């Protein structure tokens, strides 16, 4: 039962971050039941998310939010496998040139959805206010 609860929470979390759509989660839940697979494995098998992204949200996300340290948007997006080292370097260069925010550039390049940036920034800011 606990595994089912964790899987539902994973699906909700990924939807909240706008990493998967309602339709994708419905298909994944059907496939999960039909094939007895874990939700994250189904999402990876469909090619909707990377294994690194699933692992980040299963093992690291709650830890990051619970720790007293500050984590940057850049760090979280990289750890979640949503941006590559090369993309991060290009964003940093553009930041120096344009003085725009990291998230703004990532969205403008269409590497990350604006709602995903909002999700991370909101969670990170909320955690900092709570500490």
Where do the model's predicted regions map?
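Non-catalytic accessory regions
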Residues: 1-131
């Amino acid at each position: 039962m606990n595994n089912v609860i964790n899987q539902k929470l994973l699906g909700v979390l990924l939807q909240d971050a706008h990493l998967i759509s309602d339709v994708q989660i419905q298909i994944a839940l059907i496939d999960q039941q039909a094939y007895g697979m874990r939700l994250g494995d189904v999402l990876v098998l469909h090619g909707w998310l990377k294994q690194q992204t699933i692992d980040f949200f299963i093992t690291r996300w709650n830890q990051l939010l619970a720790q007293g340290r500050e984590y940057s948007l850049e760090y979280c997006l990289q750890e979640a496998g949503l941006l590559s080292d090369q993309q991060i370097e290009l964003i940093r260069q553009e930041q120096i040139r344009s003085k725009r925010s990291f998230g703004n550039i990532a969205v403008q390049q269409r590497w990350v959805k604006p709602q995903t940036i909002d999700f991370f920034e909101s969670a990170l800011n909320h955690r900092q206010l709570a500490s």
